[in-house]
Amino acid sequence: MKKTAFLRRGTCVLLAIIMVCTLIVPALAAPAGADEGINLKIAVLSDTHYLSPDMIKDTADFRKSLNSDRKLMTEGSAINLKLLEAVREDKPDILLISGDITKDGELEGHRDMAARLQQLQKDVPGLKVYVINGNHDVRNAGAKNYNTPDGKAVKATRTQPSDFVSAYSFVYNDETVIARFVPSEGKEAGQLSYVARPCEGVTIIALDTCCYSKDNTSKGKNEHETRGAMSDELVAWATEQISAAKAKGDHVIAFSHHGFVPHFSMEPEILKIYLIEDFKKIATQFADAGLEMVFTGHMHANDIAAMTTKNGNTLYDVETGSNLTYPSPARFVQLREVGDSLVASVNTLNHVGPITYYNALTGKTETIKDLTAYGKEAGFTPEMLNTVAGTFVGNILKKFVTVETSVSDWINARIIKNIQAIVTDVVNIPITEDKNLLDVANYIYQSHLGGEDDGNYPDWVQVGLDKVKSGEVVDQLLAIVKKHAFGDVASGIKFDNIFTKAVKAAMSDYIYRIAVSMGNDTNFTDDNDALIVLSGSLKAASVAVSCDGKTMNAPAIVDNGVCTVFPTRILMRELGAAGKAVTVDASASGAETVCVWERGAKALAAADKVNFIAANGSMEFAAAGLATGGDVYTAIASAVPNDAQKRALGNQLNTAAPFVVNATVDGNAITAPCSVTLGYKPGDEGSNTLTVVSVGDKGEIASADGRYEGGVMKCTVPANTLSAVVRFPFFDVSEGAWYFGDIVYAYNNGLFSGTGDHTFEPETTMTRGMLVSVLWRLEGKPEAAASPFTDSGDSWYTKAVDWAAANGIVAGTSATTFEPNATVTREQMAAILFRYANFKKLDTSARADLTAFPDAGSVSAYATDAMSWANASGIIVGSNGKLVPQDGASRAQVAAILHRFIEKCIF
């Protein structure tokens, strides 16, 4: 169908427009690699220490067990269920559990946990579960049942290696398990190790680093030990598996119970049983073979440590804390190939709750509102220290006191005999007015457990460290020991001769170094939430995330114009962002697209709104719409309008800078409103008439509440809908009015001019001369012979009336009069448009039954056919259910009717 002259655009002009738009608003970068290559979601739990509630009873034996460590055993079953529920909600591809699944290797506990894990697999289709044993899990003589009639604990069923395999047969027999380690004849060490290949490109090696068989226990017995070790043949086998996987082009990760890299500088000296023996040698060998990351546990701490070999190969040891001790975390890791790199996003979940459980100690059902806060209260206590102090005293004597064994035994015996009084006084050594030595010890230790060991101590902790360093604390400690255990004169003299000034100084220095080592871990910057580039050329960066004037950094990567940001639950909590507006400022990255992976989007959902700032503008969304599942991509991109949108923009097409907010969640377009800010340079006309409109696929124009402020345009547009910056000079046309889009269309296409520089007078009635002038301009202002109307005169509408009369579009009110200044009625407008359509040789066959309107009888005979056609064509649809044919048509109504006429009849 022939197009009218005012809407024609040449190919050269279009190309120029597209180039200008591209320069103004850069094109959206494709989310490269988003659906290609490795993309694994992994959940990690460790040290679940499950004890069946059926084995718990409030007895002296059970309370003694509770006092021996910090585990939340009574609450444990409910805690484990809650964290498994978190895994269920996350729907990962893989769940890793890095040992100490049970309290003390109770077979009943392994079977219970296996059942829970199998149910989890049913609930999360496709989930692969891989487990490995910890030092508590196999051949543990401490396996006990505390729920007995007489209150005396009895032995529970002890788990043998074969029992472990049987309980977790669904793991060991899984189709993805491609190899198992078989020790040489007569040996058992490492026998629970295996290799799995859950997907193309990734190999996972489960390493049994525990000592429970006579060929690798220090006493040559088949009884568990806390320490970890790998036999030479297990190391060789694991190295072969790593090399074989690399030969296939796989990335290799592992998991085990014991650590491969120290998680604080003094760990090899004071807590070496939490690392495998010869850790440096073995870690180096594995890293050089191609192992990139190992997930560990054992220490009940959240920490990430890295080591790099002389050959330049780096191994990351990601240690996960226990469910049952502060901060009771779960890890959520995503492995994804981005460009040429493999990226690991490590997030920590804590502060879960509420958790309801039966408390066997009180006989009541109780609720934990916040597990992390609850666990923090379960730090070291005097009762617990009474239980473990003997070992600590022995180690201190061995390290600092050079005396005969008999003397050492004498000191040790006296201290143990009076341990309760000593511990009570020692923990209460004052540090400040309201803090004591136990407070400092708990703070330092828990900061390491929680992955918060950044050296940013509260003032009172620093005071405590200073007192340790100066020797003041050790002086008070030894004075307390002397008072309670060596009070007689002779013993006191002997004690002073042993604990000389030099010994005290060495002890102070040692304790201070331990505290600083645990409280200020400098090996890796973030132990809870980290972004690790395991291979490739990408570099980890950071992006500012802010809320209420507080700013923190979130890890990020930039690739191919896309800045992927990794906000976390911990970051959102520390910002206090719940229910508030959050800004993710990626502008410094230079990227035009901001991406957040699924878990990060769920973290952002805690906010009310999220504002993403890219290099070319910002986009603000309601946070709830970002957490529906899947990755979030947002970008302000140049847009190429379709034909209907080109007509809507009309004469402003070459200056409108069409753009679109491309926003998706899991590949699905977001259509919700989005507040946008983008850079814009006004032309010579200035900025006071600038606004923004959104233009639908069919050319529908809607206000975007656009306004120019200090070098930027601000607006609210539907995401994934073309929008444009346009000039609209009429201040009396409300952007919320029903006719706003129609008047914009008319203005953009030169159909109407205003009644003044900034007035349109939308409610003013239209004259006959105005209407004919609009059609004349629509036709391209053709010349015509003079009309017979004597009242058209020499005026702005004269040529339009001449043209309309010459072509039978108007007939006048008499043979010689046109009445150009008379108000055009709705039926006159229908008649004029009907004749114009026939002049254009458009299809005018459509008819509607006007009797449906109560005022149909008031339509003049000459206009009946035209009104029927106009109604059937959707041009005149009535007002409040009536045709009101004799009413004058307002300028706004005429704009709307002409808009419909052009789009419905001409195009």
Locations of regions flagged by a protein language model:
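Extended active-site neighborhood of metal-dependent phosphoesterases/phosphodiesterases
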Residues: 112-236, 311, 332
